Amino acid sequence: AASGTAAQGGGDLVIYSPNSEGLLNATIPLFEEKYGVNVELIQAGTGELVKRIQSEKNDPYADVLFGGSWSLMYTNEDLWEPYVSANDANVIDAYKNKCGFITGNVLDGSVLIVNTDLIGDIKIEGYEDLLNPALKGKIATADPANSSSAFAHLTNMLLAMGGYEDDKAWQYVHDLFENVDGKICESSSGVYKGVADGEYVVGLSYEDPCAQLVLDGAPVKIVYM
């Protein structure tokens, strides 16, 4: 984000982030230790954070948006200051900062997270399986307009079903959300936490927090998309 407190010469850095607790806990303390900076971390979904940055455009509070949807960043180009990391030259070409204001920091795949205590004999191996009537009202997803992980799933399923311009692909999206039955989680974290807690059978999520739940012994498994 443009010109927050640290940019004005203070010793604090304000970071807005939709990233998982695991990633933030692994990076923020080490960053503070290495650079002697005190971080004020504000966590919310990508859409909520971008809206906040929009409202603060004339008096920015945040210094950095750490994580989120590239599409939302591209469509709000006026919110960001130009920045290209000195390490960009070491990044493989496909992931270099070519726009001048987005620095990629992680490759994190889309996954389905499945509650192994609830799934029974229902097959879940891909997007088509989510149309099973037995899963109606038992599928967790966030709003693609506000969640970067939900938006990633939307683009993935459209491509998997025929492409962005394909009527059958959009019909799949319609049918899926009919099966979701109006149960839209407020954030990405609500998806994987809801599945792990047994509120949902399956959720459309992303690798990092779901893998951590598996490592922590939660009754879940991951299906990579």
Which residues are covered by each model-predicted region?
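Histidine- and/or cysteine-centered catalytic micro-motif in compact active-site loops
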Residues: P144, S188, S205-P209, M225
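Short, polar/charged alpha-helical segment
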Residues: S17-N38, V214
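A ligand-binding cleft/hinge motif common to bilobed small-molecule-binding domains
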Residues: S71-N76, A196-V220
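Short, low-complexity disordered leader/linker segments with a strong preference
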Residues: A1-L13
